[in-house]
Amino acid sequence: MVNYKELGLVNTKEMFAKAVEGGYAIPAFNFNNMEQMQAIIKAAVETKSPVILQVSKGARQYANATLLRYMAQGAVEYAKELGCEKPEIVLHLDHGDTFETCKSCIDSGFSSVMIDGSHLPYEENVALTKKVVEYAHQFDVTVEGELGVLAGVEDEVSSDHHTYTDPEEVIDFATRTGCDSLAISIGTSHGAYKFTPEQCTIDEKTGLMVPPPLAFDVLKAVEAKLPGFPIVLHGSSSVPQEEVATINKFGGALKAAIGIPEEWLRESAKSALCKINIDSDSRLAMTAAIRQTFAEKPAEFDPRKYLGPARDNMEKMYKHKIINVLGSDGKLSC
């Protein structure tokens, strides 16, 4: 067994407490490969932000659990090389669906795990989450639970519809499970196709599609039931239209890809909603840069020549999110 402290990682407990008190959110960026990790760490160090390196079950299988562990350790050392003596980096399992998956991650150095039992009947969700919490807390690993179901598709996570979190359940769930944070459903969705055009209205000034409002009343009700308790929002990519346009310009076929307006996320981050998950925006930034490079340099076959621009574009996006959306910049002394 490898404990996350041996890798120089931290859990989310103190990080979330500071974010709730300070009115900002911690960026939770999903990653699958070295270029994404490099971009995330460089952006976090240069903006002096704590950060969560988030890995789905599918990404862990793709990258290999052993290599992933060393990448996480390397991320800490890379941050120090970049000038941050005391980086705050979490390695988090996103959407763990079984106790065995969560245990495997805890045993291999993860500092935080999510157990997603939201698809189960309520009592089964409580029992599964509690089981993970009891194991994780032995090793000071923090646990994220979930109430409510998000629509959309992302890796193995798939649902045709969303179910809002019931505020009347949150006290019982948090108390009985002992979870350290709670992911809720207020209308966001996984993936780049969060809403259909029929669900949206057209902004007369910009001509862009505006999605239906999120259920902020649910968020407020949850906060009222659990004052100061760390709340998590999944499916929070904004799907930048400039990246979508670049992808489509150079041979892509992303039609009606619509995300969450960034101003909604910034307002949410001022509450107890202290962890905001972003995955699709990273994929879009990477894909846009790669497609553009291939179109402009069709003879190019050196991976460094197209993955380098992809890394730079992702870093730019991560910095923007940290500074302008989440407000977590400047929160580290480094």
Map each language-model feature to its residues.
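Generic N-terminal amphipathic, Lys/Arg-enriched alpha-helix
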Residues: 1-27, 300-301
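A short N-terminal beta->alpha junction/helix N-cap motif
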Residues: 3, 24-32, 59-60, 305, ...
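Alpha/beta enzyme core
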Residues: 10-21, 34-59, 66-86, 95-230, ...
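Extended, intrinsically disordered, low-complexity segments
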Residues: 289-334
